[in-house]
Regions:
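Short, Lys/Arg-enriched N-terminal segments with co-localized hydrophobic residues
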Residues: 1-14
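A short beta-strand-turn-helix
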Residues: 17-34
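Conserved helix-turn-beta segment immediately C-terminal to the redox Cys motif
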Residues: 32-34, 51-70
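Short pre-active-site segment immediately N-terminal to redox-active cysteine/selenocysteine motifs
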Residues: 33, 40-43, 86
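ABC family nucleotide-binding domain
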Residues: 38, 51, 62, 81-84
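Conserved redox-active cysteine motifs that mediate thiol-disulfide chemistry
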Residues: 39-53
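Structural micro-motif
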Residues: 76, 82-91
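Non-catalytic, surface beta->alpha helical segment in thiol-disulfide oxidoreductase systems
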Residues: 86, 94-121
């Protein structure tokens, strides 16, 4: 499983998210923690724009969930199997099953609300 890491400079926090491939997807979503997966592509401007908020969420919620990213260009079979038609799409998994999803969240607050509402279900 690969990791994307950003260097810490001048008080900035290190942000880490898991880069998910086909071999690791099934294993990851069956973890005991909740798993939040961002389906995205590098050519998607909106995906890149919301990426910083997603990285902050992955750090702030690391005690309750694992955050990962699936590049649909590199892993189209995962996107197809999960019926991802629009990007960015965030999917929350529990015990190997998708429990909720959100398409094109507009802000970090929207992602937080999505997670909190899903946790209440």
């Amino acid at each position: 499983m690969g990791y994307i890491k950003f260097k810490q400079e001048k008080g900035l926090k290190i942000m880490t998210s898991i880069n998910i491939n086909k071999e690791k997807f099934g294993q990851l979503i069956h973890k005991e923690k909740l798993v939040l997966v961002d389906f995205w592509a590098p050519w998607c401007g909106y995906c890149r724009r919301i990426g910083a908020a997603y990285e902050k969420i992955s750090e702030e919620y690391s005690d309750i969930l694992i955050a990962g990213k699936v590049n649909i260009d590199e892993e189209p079979q995962i996107a197809e199997a999960e019926k991802i038609e629009i990007i960015p799409t965030l999917v929350l998994y529990r015990d190997g099953k998708a429990i909720d999803s959100i398409v094109a969240p507009e802000s970090k607050k929207m992602i937080e609300n999505f997670i909190n509402e899903a946790l209440e279900k």
